[in-house]
Every structure is written in structure tokens, then in C-alpha cells.
Amino acid sequence: MSSKIPLLFIISFGLYVSTTNSSPIERRSLWNFFFMTFIGGKRAPWKYDGYGNHCGIGGKGSPVDSIDRCCQVHDRCYHEVNENECGSYKRNVKFIDYDWYMQDKQIVCDTTDTVCAQAICKCDKDIVECLNQNDKDYNPKYNKAIG
């Protein structure tokens, strides 16, 4: 499995670069979230996929710990943004572009984006910060993808 991770990253990065024609960190929300976690987070993004009951696709039940709670809050944030700030869009917030950058080791959402894009960026920024703050609680036994 460990040899697949670098290959997965290389393929993901290649797709990331090849699917963009804009500034270095302007991508569709899922790519933004992946790279925001990769660059601004304490753990690789794939360490959270399948973690607990809420990290990754779907989400149900009670969070198993504070890491899983971060993912639950993120899911709710996306839902709220999809209903409110992005309600006029006819697509899921996971596929709306936004801009962000790092400044003094902090994630900054671009204020020139639409209200919708800024709200999505804030959801992603908040989860990365939440995951970082609760990193001590990360327990590999809760990761269904690797455990």
C-alpha cells in the first residue's frame, strides 16, 4: 500500500496541473481541499479518507473522535453553503472554483472571489485548521481505508 501512495500523489498532481489553466492555487473545490490539506495540514489528505463515520464520502452516525467531528462539521458547512451562499448555482459546491493562498503559514481565502466561492473556501480552511488542532487525537484504528 505504501508504494501506491507516492504513485497516487504523482497521478493526482499530474491531473491537477493538466486540468488547470489559471493561477497556481485556483482549482475546483475538491482539488482545493486536497491541496489545502496537503500544504496547510499536518497529515496527508489521504490519511483522512475513510476515517471514522464522516471523513470521506458520505457520513452518518456519531463522530468517533474530534477528527471525525471536524469532518462532520465540514459536511454540514458544505450543506449550509450549498443551500445559502451558493443556492443560485445549479451544481454542487464540491465543483465550484475558489482561490486561496498561504501567507505566514496561514491559509487565506481570496476575498475577490464570489460570496459562494469564499464560503466554500472558508469551509475547507476551517476543516484544515480543525484537523490540525485535533491532530493529537488521530487514531489509525478509525481509518477504514488503511486499518
From Swiss-Prot:
The UniProt entry, under SUPFAM superfamilies, shows:
Phospholipase A2, PLA2
- Keyword presence, Endoplasmic reticulum: no
Propeptide intervals in chain numbering: 23-28
> Tissue expression, per UniProt?
Expressed by the venom gland.
- Active site at which residues? 74, 124
Q: Name the UniProt key words of this record, in alphabetical order.
A: Calcium, Cleavage on pair of basic residues, Disulfide bond, Hydrolase, Lipid degradation, Lipid metabolism, Metal-binding, Secreted, Signal
User: What cofactor does this chain's UniProt record say it requires?
Assistant: Ca(2+)
Q: Which GO terms describe its cellular component?
A: extracellular region
The compartments listed are: Secreted
A Gene Ontology biological process term: phospholipid metabolic process
Disulfide bridges in this chain = 55-71, 70-130, 77-123, 86-116, 109-121
Q: How is the cofactor bound?
A: Binds 1 Ca(2+) ion.
* PANTHER family with a match to the protein in the record: PHOSPHOLIPASE A2, PHOSPHOLIPASE A2 FAMILY MEMBER
Protein's UniProt name? Phospholipase A2 Scol/Pla
Originating species = Scolopendra viridis (Giant centipede)
Q: What is the lineage of its organism?
A: Eukaryota, Metazoa, Ecdysozoa, Arthropoda, Myriapoda
